[in-house]
Amino acid sequence: MKSYLFLTVHLILLILYPAICLADADRIFKENNRAVVVVIAYDKQDKPIGQGSGFIVRPDGAIVTNYHVISNAVDIKVKAGDKVLKVEGLLHIDRENDIVILKADAKNLPTVKLGDIEKATIGEKVYVISSPKGLENTISDGILSGIREISDKRKILQITAPVSPGSSGGAVFNKNGEVIGIATFIIEEAQNLNFAMPVNLIKDKISAKKVIALKDAGIEDYKETADYWFTLGYFYGEAGLHKEAIEAYKQAIRIKP
């Protein structure tokens, strides 16, 4: 009798699980959609040279995205719903981890809630809100499949939630609707290998007040930095693409012997 009851309950849970996940995705999207933005980088001719995603962490326009999204930018604009916000400058630059915090000219913006990756568990459900391939604010879901150590004190998150070009800088949420990661890298040569930087890297940086003007920030081409090639080499290694990993590491050494 107990076995029958257990099987019945287990079957009911299996039937309900997809509906529960869909409900979570719908709730998370509705709660956070307005706090996820499109980030567009422009050159000195005012032509767009890069586009990615970002998320708002302060009502006055502090926005987190990837450094590579704004590579070589002379001007940056943020599309938040039907508003286009001009970026005044940068509050924080972390080239090593491919993270930047922008400061847009804004007030009373909706914000996301930040979680703690130290409390995350492998296998837990995650949701990514981003703008892949220019499709504004779409949501995808998957699991947190790994927390990897690139080097001493550097961690990355491996997720199965589908992401595409344009998703970089997007928010990775847990089931509680808290951001635990920043969608950062896709290994296109390997199926379902997507990586995110832990949100803990920026939690103590979002209160920064000093704005660095774009012209003084020294924004360079991320692909011309050793940090880019070192990180790429690590990701290739995780994907089993050892030849590509070696070449990436060699390039990192060429740039920074």
Language model region names:
Residues 23-30, 39, 73, 88, ...:
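C-terminal cap/linker of serine protease catalytic domains
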Residues 45-48, 58-130, 134-138, 152-156, ...:
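Conserved active-site neighborhood of the chymotrypsin/trypsin-like protease fold
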Residues 55-56, 144, 163-183:
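Catalytic nucleophile loop of clan PA
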Residues 251-254:
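Conserved structural position within tetratricopeptide repeats
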